[in-house]
């Protein structure tokens, strides 16, 4: 059976990615990152989603990105904004997806996976530069050059099935695949029980997505 590594944050998008990868016939191995983020409950959500959707393995990789700072998600001295603004927001974590994908690439090579799934999106998103198609295309080129599998003509494919979908379309796709979004945590500052603030940009996008999809929002709010 073909294998895939799925980056799993515990949020709505990455959970949908896992459901899609499974539906496409991949034996899935999930990977989450403890990078010093505010929302610790998202790691619990990632483990929960991985188990319910039948991933063959789940790994949590510890990273010290909080030591770098520069983001409201890793530096508690920077407040999480309640409204989206112009430009790249302070919730952007410098180089996060580059680091995450690099580690997922290493795992994929070790387990001989054919694909890496990541839930980046360029429609209903916060404007992060490492969620754009151009970034994924560049990383794909790098991955082909930088790995034994790529050099030997077996490059791993970076799969981004959500890239051009609206949040409502993502939710509808997940619901069609039987995904329970009550398992997920998307909030930038959820409490230890996964209850969402209802005010941050991630909460706004999630809530609007359920409304537009005509699907009941299962999110628990503080």
Curated annotation (Swiss-Prot):
InterPro entries: QueC, Rossmann-like_a/b/a_fold. GO terms for molecular function: ATP binding; ligase activity, forming carbon-nitrogen bonds; zinc ion binding. Pathway: Purine metabolism; 7-cyano-7-deazaguanine biosynthesis. CDD domains: QueC-like. It comes from the Bacteria. One of its GO terms (biological process) is queuosine biosynthetic process. ATP binds at residues 8-18. It is an enzyme of class 6 (ligase). Binds 1 zinc ion per subunit. Zn(2+) binds at residues 187, 197, 200, 203. Its EC number is 6.3.4.20. The keyword Ligase applies. Belongs to the QueC family. Catalyzes the ATP-dependent conversion of 7-carboxy-7-deazaguanine (CDG) to 7-cyano-7-deazaguanine (preQ(0)). HAMAP family: QueC. This is 7-cyano-7-deazaguanine synthase. It comes from Alcanivorax borkumensis (strain ATCC 700651 / DSM 11573 / NCIMB 13689 / SK2). The gene is queC.
